[in-house]
Amino acid sequence: MNTNVFRLLLLGSLFSLSACVQQSEVRQMKHSVSTLNQEMTQLNQETVKITQQNRLNAKSSSGVYLLPGAKTPARLESQIGTLRMSLVNITPDADGTTLTLRIQGESNDPLPAFSGTVEYGQIQGTIDNFQEINVQNQLINAPASVLAPSDVDIPLQLKGISVDQLGFVRVHDIQPVMQ
């Protein structure tokens, strides 16, 4: 009889352990699905922003639009050559938003010293019928690069606009500067 009781206890323990293992696997699966849903939502939002950025740039006759949520560069044909531009390190601060404008030359030559204009603000309406509101601008200057291909990071302080309000950054009038 002792062996039957022992077998019964062992069998009960195995059922309990198997139930725990299954619950653990179910919890892990739920966590994986939740993480995947969050990643898909973020990917969908980035895709929408990339599409919007591409449409704005297709319609733009002057400069290049960069949308904070796009997280992808855009090309600008300028007086100093073809440039790839992107926004990185976008963070809130007490006066608005700080970010870095990354400019990369696409040729094998170093970039000359240059200046340009950065406009930023909000976009109201649809991409097909939009209006830029609360637009502010600032001039940028970059020294000549020594190395090629050239990357220039320009820190920007966008005063008076929070990260959530920032709808666009537009860079235009890139011109060489004589030193």
For each predicted feature, which ranges?
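Sec-dependent bacterial lipoprotein signal peptides
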Residues: 1-20
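Contiguous hydrophobic segments
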Residues: 2-5, 32-51, 155-179
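Solvent-exposed, flexible loop/coil residues
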Residues: 5, 70, 115
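Short, solvent-exposed coil/turn linker segments
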Residues: 16, 22, 162-165
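Membrane engagement elements in two modes
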Residues: 20-88, 92-98
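Membrane-proximal structural modules of membrane-associated proteins and complexes
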Residues: 73-179
